[in-house]
Structure formats: structure tokens, C-alpha cells
């Protein structure tokens, strides 16, 4: 199934309902990459990544929410949606604009679905996985921090991620929605929602000099310009 095809979402949902009679879990996991720096890559390659990594999860979720709502009203336990993101979507990485853009959008979609489905008690959460997948092994030739990141992550079993996905669909996870989790071997962590870290104000509009002065006062709260490789350069709990 080409998840980026226009009718793929409806086709997948129809097949699942026909085979199992209901939909208890939707996992948006399919993803592709197109490594290129901005200004060097092709637009069609960038758009292909967005269609697979972001539009396809939207389409599959859109096709599934109707049946999931109806079966919940009929008395079935509410289902769940789990979106699989990436640390690149949170931190960025040079040469990975397409993945970063699509996976950052997936986090916004996760929050929005959680809000829209709260009345039906259908949960939607996202997971940022660190595991020895084909994508990690495909990094290939690398040196320095990227090589160390690849080698550390390659030791982590993907089953750790699968166990959390299964839990988020279980009755014990009732009430957990709109959250972003990370799985790195035997370590599970929750990301905070982005919120203002500091602020400043004045009675009138800021001019350029006043902006400069105000932002100097906020500088201690600026986010570090570190990519995911730098942020997770320590040894995982494998």
C-alpha cells in the first residue's frame, strides 16, 4: 500500500473494518527521507516526503475517526491513534529539512487530534523513537558525533518502542492523550509542551533599539542551537 496515494487512508480503514469489525488502534509509522540542504534539493522530493510523513497520517486518521467515534458510541472501548515522530522534527538537523518539517507538523497534528477527539475519549499521542532501524543503519559513512550517534542507536531494540505503542492502546492508558513520548532503549521520557520561557513588555511598541535591549535580557532563555545528534550524544540505557 502506498500510504501517500489519495485513497490509501480510506482503503486501509475499509480493509481493517472488514477484517476485524472495528478499529482500536491507528499507528502512523510510515516515513521516508530526502537528504538535501535547503537550496540544493528538489521541490518534488521535499513534497514527496511531506505527502508520506504528514499528509498520509492526516488522511489515515481522517478516515479512521468516523468509525472510531461510531464504535465508541455503540459501547466499544475508545480507541487510540499513535503518531511516530522523530527527534529531527524537534531539534532539526542540517540536510534534513524535509524530515524536520514533516515530523514537526506531525506533532501539531497529534495535539490537534487529541483536542478534537477528547469528547469521544479517543486518545492521540506521539512517540519519538530511538532504535536500530533501517533508517539508522542507512546513515552509512559518517564520522565524529554522527557516527557515534548511529552506533549507539543501532544497539537499541525497536521492540522497546513497540511495547509503548501497545500500551498506549491498552485500557491502562485511558486518559493519556496529546502527549509526546521518547523511547531510547529502556528509557522512556515525556517531552514538555512548548511554552514561553520568559517575556518582557513595555507600554508602547518596541523599536529596533528597544528590541535589542529586551532580547538581551531574554538571551539566557534562548534555546540552544543543537541538533538531535548533539542533544542525544550520551550513552543510552540499552
Regions found by a protein language model. Give the residues of each.
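Active-site-adjacent segment of SDR/Rossmann-fold oxidoreductases
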Residues: 91, 107, 112-122, 171-174
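Substrate-binding pocket helix/loop in short-chain dehydrogenase/reductase
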Residues: 37-47
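A glycine-rich helix->loop->beta "capping" turn
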Residues: 15-26, 34, 75, 123
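The beta1-alpha1 cofactor-binding region of Rossmann-like NAD(H)/NADP(H)-dependent oxidoreductases
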Residues: 1-11, 43
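C-terminal helical subdomain
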Residues: 126, 147-238
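Residue(s) in the substrate-gating loop at a strand-loop-helix junction
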Residues: 86
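Active-site helix of classical SDR
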Residues: 61, 102, 110
